[in-house]
Structure formats: C-alpha cells, structure tokens
Amino acid sequence: MFGLGGQELILILLIILLLFGAKKLPELARGLGKGMKEFKKAQTEIEDEFNKVVDEPPRKTPENSTGSKS
C-alpha cells in the first residue's frame, strides 16, 4: 500500500490524532468514507458507460450517392 509499512501507518495515524483530536476523528472518518463511496460510484458509472459504448456494434455510415465511380 504505497510502500508504507505498519510503523509508518501508525505514525501517520498518531499525527492525525494529535492534529485533529479524538472528537474529530469519527467525523473525519465518516467524511472520508462517504467521499470514497461517491468516488467508487462515479468510477463504476464511467466504466459502465465506457463498456456500453465499446460493446455497441459499429454504425454504418450512409454512402455518398453523388460521388463518381472510377
């Protein structure tokens, strides 16, 4: 996970705890969770739309009837 080990993650969490305090952590985690959920939802919608476009059969273009034949 981004090249971070367990000790680094614990250190980062302790710094966050010191910066925001214990009362703000649940609110921050809730906001982060909602943000990740929205991001994944948008990502899924984009992937579905892309797959739908890719899976469509190619459209035939109308041939030009005024063109000259050699």
Curated annotation (Swiss-Prot):
Keywords: Cell inner membrane, Cell membrane, Membrane, Protein transport, Translocation, Transmembrane, Transmembrane helix, Transport
GO process annotations (BP): protein transport by the Tat complex
Single Gene Ontology MF annotation: protein transmembrane transporter activity
Transmembrane parts of this sequence: 1-21
Keyword Cell inner membrane assigned: yes
InterPro entries: TatA/B/E, TatA/E
Name of this chain's protein: Sec-independent protein translocase protein TatA
Organism from which the protein derives: Chlorobium limicola (strain DSM 245 / NBRC 103803 / 6330)
